[in-house]
Amino acid sequence: MIELCLMKTFLNSNYATPGSTLLIDGPITYPFYFPAETSLTWSRDKLKTYSDSLEFLNSERVKIVDRLMKQGVLVVGIVKRLVKSYYLSSVDPAKLSVGRINDEAYIMMLLLRVNKTLEKPFIIGPIRVKHETSNITRLMWYIVVPRRIYPITSGMGNFVSYRVELLENNSHRKDYVLEQIFYDSFHTGSLLPLSLLVVDRRVKKITSSMVTYLLYMTGLTEESTGQYISVL
């Protein structure tokens, strides 16, 4: 919800000008996903509330993204953690036939199949994915970047992978989208888009300060820190 408020603030600001780019730390729309424990602990009413809330958030996000695109703003989602998404194995662009595995595992299997040391970045995509519960369609690219100029034996620690996505009806040229991402990463000497890394670091500091202040005001012990961090 906070992210939605920030997107609305950006929409109404002087920064949302034609030719500008908005990078979202995460997907353009949230996947229709229920935590594993919900099937055992949540009531039917609570599940419906969660589902309705998720659909509302997605519809509001898409409205904002549509308005930004009409203003000439490029809106791109960057997903850094691929262990909970399964788009690659569902579409299977490399014809690996490995069953349902997460995106990170799929990329690893692809590198093992080609049996080649990753010496330079490569791209998987674009992949067209329709949302589970709506008519929203996204285009996705997976960027795989080696960590070292001279990699050691192939392994997950030798490369960084992340997903770039945008709405299919985006009017920007697809090569222009990737150019923006590459400029903010490779051209700045970073494996991931530098803008997101800077913001992520600032957010963690702000969150840490909020937790410290909460513990100070409530008089909670340090042992309670973990619990309240998870709540925040």
Give the predicted meaning of each segment:
Residues 2-232:
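Long, contiguous domain-sized segments
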